[in-house]
């Protein structure tokens, strides 16, 4: 099967790069985080319209996109290599991580 056939989504982020994932990788995320199953539109919106974006404390190429998803926050973790962005994982959390907040920027 060609790689293009398994392409699930590609979302333009506020940081100026796009994030993508495949059907197979999305299935892996859903198996590891069953609370995300059926919530792909919310994850896509989190990438497109996050409440905030933070850099990972461990890896400067990793970005954590957060959006309120009461009573939790939805977190979409992405990695950017050159101009190629991809989803690492997604999950619900009670707390936003401590990484450096990079978006939105303060005036």
Regions found by a protein language model. Name each.
Residues 1-107:
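Ribonuclease/tRNase effector modules and their secretory precursors
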């Amino acid at each position: 099967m060609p790689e293009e056939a398994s392409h699930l989504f590609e979302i333009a982020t506020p940081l100026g790069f796009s994030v993508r994932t495949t059907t197979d990788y999305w299935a892996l995320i859903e198996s590891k985080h069953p609370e995300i199953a059926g919530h792909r539109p919310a994850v896509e919106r989190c990438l497109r319209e996050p409440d905030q974006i933070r850099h990972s404390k461990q890896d400067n190429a990793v970005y954590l996109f957060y959006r309120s998803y009461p009573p939790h926050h939805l977190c979409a973790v992405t990695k950017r290599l050159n101009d190629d962005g991809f989803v690492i994982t997604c999950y619900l959390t009670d707390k936003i991580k401590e990484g450096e907040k990079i978006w939105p920027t303060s005036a």
